[in-house]
A protein has these predicted regions:
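Solvent-exposed soluble domains appended to multi-pass membrane proteins
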Residues: 1-144
Length: 144
């Protein structure tokens, strides 16, 4: 991103054809390539771009079973379960590259969510946006 103009959206603006990537390289040496994102595939054009980057196997929110949520997003725990499931179901003996972009800590950070305690205790930290932007490591207390 350092070499792109301010405000660039690479997936939408620059990736229009097959583009070399870590995924395409690993695919070329025999890896199964998986891209996972527990949200809409149309977001940032992921459903179109991921194959251009060399990913053969895509999964988006509709593919996640037993969905658990933190705030309004599929939880990291659900996302990690999908990674494990993918790895356990890959062809025996085939290496796998599994790329996963999580959503649990995605903004907006100023909204209020039922059952979500957004309290963070730290000196000089009294901002609702910062309060929401924590790792939700205590998310199991949230009614799922």
């Amino acid at each position: 991103m350092a070499f792109l103009p301010v405000g660039s959206i690479p997936y939408q603006q620059y990736i229009k054809s097959t583009t070399p990537s870590l995924a395409s390289y690993l695919k070329s040496i025999g890896y199964a390539t998986y891209a996972q994102h527990p949200y809409y595939g149309s977001g940032w054009n992921r459903d179109t771009v991921y194959p251009l980057l060399g990913f053969d196997n895509l999964s988006f929110m509709q593919d996640y079973s037993n969905q658990r949520f933190v705030r309004k997003y599929i939880s990291d725990e659900t996302s990690f379960d999908r990674i494990i499931e993918t790895y356990e179901n890959k062809p025996d003996g085939q290496p796998a590259f599994i790329f996963n972009v999580t959503m649990q800590n995605h903004g907006g950070y100023t909204d209020t969510y039922y059952g979500f305690d957004n309290t963070v205790t730290a000196d000089k930290l009294n901002n609702s946006a910062l309060d929401q932007y924590h790792l939700a490591d205590d998310h199991r207390k949230i009614p799922l």
